[in-house]
């Protein structure tokens, strides 16, 4: 009974197929494995739906299935074989490609290894050594502008390949050096020899760049410099002058040292430790003597004994040839320093003291009248008309300003004098007004305001008036 039942179970198992599907016309898609289950994939349309989700083609849903080699179209699910390769396509036609080789890594065939070992044969072929071969290094040249002796030479690196193209070399030189005439057309050596090709250029040499103008023969060799002299150690000054040969100190070096030692001994009264006598003293004195002798020799050689001095030019300059020396004359003016000029005597003026006294009196008078001018400013505006009629009255009014400037006692005495002086003037004023009343009334306008009256009061009267006002206000 167990036998037939087991056979029926084997026959009832579902059929499962596995296929590899490629994209139509895609040479880079390596294929996608799709499993066809009998229960899940019951029809061909369901299979197309499964392939659409697995392949994810850019053309959209899969509508046709083709064989990879011949492009035969499959229309039923029964035609698909397990383990086969197929191409999924849309509504477009089949595109023939080598789909089966997509994604496979091609292995290179192994080369046949020669197992036989040949013996070494010593040959007599002459081959140049490798270290003797010239390397392809760039050519370095130094360029100088035509007729320019001021600016230093410019360094230019020319590649080895560019030396064959002479126009390209001239273009590089033009970019490096700017000439007034424009581009660089020719290169010359310092001696004036024309360079016509890049093969004539030598590494590390100096050349003159010339434009449209002619080559100027100048001492370009003065621009050549020693690189070792240009380099200086770290911390040294850039513009360091050479030591002076034959200075004044070198002549009297011995006397200078002796005087310095005597001055130091006189200034410093403290006792100094005694030096030990022996070999050290003799050794220390020898090099100093040698240095002094060397300095004296150099100083005698440097300074000539002509009596003309070191500031006298040895040879005549080309610029001063033919120039005549101008002799001094009576009309020539010579500037003399201030210390050497004769002293000039200035006579004092007789009126100097008088003018100084008048100035001092005016200053004192203006200081005393400073306060009165502010107070009497308003009153002066009203009394200007009266001062026009009587000129002498204005001079006499200056006395009250002095009265206000002093103390109370002085003001009291001066006020009495002022009152006595003003009485005859008031009488004269009344007479003049009586005589000229008819003429003044006829000449004046009816709308003219009356003249203000000026009264002079002492400080004591002012205090009494203020006290009376205060008492009346209290009452």
Curated annotation (Swiss-Prot):
Sequence positions bearing Phosphoserine: 270
Cellular localization per UniProt: Cell projection, Cilium; Cytoplasm, Cytoskeleton, Cilium axoneme; Cell projection, Kinocilium; Cytoplasm, Cytoskeleton
Bias (Basic and acidic residues) ranges: 353-365
Biased composition (Polar residues): 252-272
Biased composition (Acidic residues): 407-425
Keyword terms, alphabetized: Cell projection, Cilium biogenesis/degradation, Cytoplasm, Cytoskeleton, Neurogenesis, Phosphoprotein, Repeat
A single Gene Ontology CC term: cytoplasm
Tissue: Expressed in hair cells of the inner ear.
Keyword Endoplasmic reticulum belongs to the record: no
Disruption phenotype: Animals develop periportal hepatic fibrosis with biliary duct proliferation at age 11 months.
PROSITE patterns: DC (PS50309)
Residues of the Doublecortin domain: 17-100, 139-221
Region (Disordered): 234-475
Gene Ontology BP, a term: sensory perception of sound
Signal peptide segment: none
Assembly, per entry: Interacts with DVL1, DVL2 and DVL3.
Function description: Protein that plays a role in the inhibition of canonical Wnt signaling pathway. May be involved in neuronal migration during development of the cerebral neocortex. Involved in the control of ciliogenesis and ciliary length.
Protein name: Doublecortin domain-containing protein 2
The species this protein was found in: Mus musculus (Mouse)
Gene of this entry: Dcdc2
